Amino acid sequence: MKDQKRLKNILAESSRFAVIVELTGGPNYNFSPIEKFLKSYQENQGRDLPSDFILAGITLPQNPGGVANIDPSDVIAVIEKERLAGDLDIIPHITSKDANTDSLTSTLAGYRRRGIESILALTGDKPTTAQGVFEVESIGLLSLIKQHNQNTLLNAKPGGWNQVHQFYAGAAVSPFKYTEPSLMQQYYKMEKKIAAGAEFLITQVGWDWKKSLELMQYLKENRISIPVIGNVYWLSTLTPAPRLMHDIKLPGCFVSDALLAQLQSESVDQHIDRAAQQIAMYRAIGATGVDVGGVHDYPTFVKILQRAAEIGTNWQPYKDNLYWPAEKTFYLYEDNGRQASLSKPCKKCRDRFFDFMHLSILDPDYPGFHVFKKTLKLFGAQKESNFTYKAFNAIEKSFKYLMFECQECGDCYLPENFGYCTIGECEKGMDNAPCGDATVEGYCGNNLNRLCIGEYIYNSASAHKNGREKLRQMTNKPRIPSLEHTSSLVNYLFGKDHTMRSPLIQIAEAIHASIPKTGKIMKELHALGADAYTRPSGPLDYVRALIETQADEGADYIAVNLDAFGEDNPDMAVEMMKEYVKLVRQWGKGIPVCVDSSNDDVLIAGLKEWYNTDQPVRPPQLNSIKLFTADKMMPLKKQYDFCFIGLLVTEDKAKGPGGSHSVEELFDLAQQIYAKAMQYGFKASEIFFDSTVFPIAIDMPMEPGVPGYTYRAFETIKRIKSDPKLKHCHCSLGVSNCCRDLPGRKIGICRAYVAKAMECGLDAGIVNTSHQYGLKEVDEELLQLISAYAAMDGSPEKLNEAMTRMGQFCASTRKPT
């Protein structure tokens, strides 16, 4: 069956060595080379292939070499129409060179519709005649694919996991680099690609067995477990490929003078032998398979594999035939297996100048930043229509063009790139340089007159304290297109660029067992048995998607609430919380957990499990501690570092109007919780007060003169934030509760609710992170509605205004019957 032949299953389970073959159209967009190969394979279903090899599929490049060719989507359409694929997987290359993110998303949707699962995500070759796009590069593309997979999972119905389409995305890596910066940047970027969602690797073409072995050693040394497919290109003088690679006409590919001369002196059979020897080499050193390219003649392809099978794993006698390095070489590992020492360059004048300027006026930890920002604000430079803005922007553009070849992206990554611009100083204008096209000397393969920007960035990073590790860990997000041609300095200073964060401390709410769909999937997961939280499954993938998407959306804490399971079985909730805390620690990208429960035993279990690891973790949050549980929970601070949400509720009878707690009572509770927390060693910044959200749909006082719940919640926040002692504490609300039972526009209501609460001092919230509260514009009418409820102090006039606005809102959102 075809499902059993998918590349993912073969790489993971097959005892045979996987082979995929790269097929391209001929001159003048000719499909016949692809058709001829596939028909030859179909004639005997691969029975002429060696028994210990399995042909898993075909890969379809997208405009290789930057030259227009048949698009993979069109090739797939013909293959499907003529039923040429049989049991083979179809693995299209998808690149960002010719398409923006909208177009890439459409392509992914089309592949999903066709059932294409395996894809190879690449930056792509720079077009030779057309204008490249490169809105994202390989890391951004992999992130887009991962987001597509997550959305598909999150939209799936419980129990239907077998029908959920998931892309199996691969990425490229080139170990065939001979300068330290080029090589290390390839390995760093490889790690970033894996973090972004790459599930298998395909190497670049190259003929240096030491470099191939070096890649496998690097993966092992760094405990990276991922299938590796070696790229075996049939290099033969029957085609112009050797000459083009030698003459740097195919950037990223290297054929030395010696190799070219050797090829020209050899027969075709000797060319076949070299490809076979390389396959045997990859098989012996631990690769999971090979990608064979440059072969459109099926009998030749079979001959290569048969010869490789004869060699088996005894490839060492052919080392010299697979060793064609550059003249000047850098190898990460010495012959004895030890890692070579990396360079320790000194800062250049440019580095020192950039660091000085950045620290002086652009580092928020230094006074100059705040003085500079206030000065620009004083002159109105934050408004694009002002003359001051235009004058400043003109000066900035001129200066930055002279210094950094600035291209006015408006979303500047100079600090992240150690003072180098990856648009103006890179031929592809990439977010995460380099691309892999550099020559063996480190020059740009697309412009031999300039050194690859990756070389500059690496050398500058190496000159900074911990710079290499920072470079290794840092991934730049795609730039914000709408900021192009605006002032990047103004955008940075006023939080409009990629550094923009929500003004709220976001406590992500999605992992909550009381949410019907989520609770059902949690139950389904738990029913899978003792290894449910470690064995791959649809429900576990769903939970992982919840965790990762919330982390990507800027969560500061990832909340887990399992109280729905603890209603009948408290011990079950305790054990489940331990498992979910592990999952957040594993997949939360360093974001701490918020253990959310009304059961103190669950809180304690989650807190202890969070620290049950040898890895460093950030302090978690407990939600919640009440005044009457403080003496049980707060002593844990001595052993475990954590912050907490102090819920402003009490077991005492309310004394406020209408039998509810007044603002004074709620404020008094906050003061008492604060005093307790100080006794147990908490800082004010580790306390989050929750004055409780009441749905505005039912926020109607039952007696005259009684303030509304929204009024009390907001006024309590005001009191806390204006108190000399409590003002450094945080105020948090469960925002999504405010829109419950409303007929529509719930997200807009939540946005307006947050905006109004922030006016009162709200600085944290249990929220749906995808709504990006505090960053998107609020509807004025909805803000007026929330303002009316926030002002409902018990007077008839305020009550009447709130009810009138609610009536108008319901009338405008009611759906026709």
Which positions does each model-derived feature cover?
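Catalytic alpha/beta core domains of metabolic enzymes, predominantly
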Residues: 65-304, 313-319, 367-398, 405-412, ...
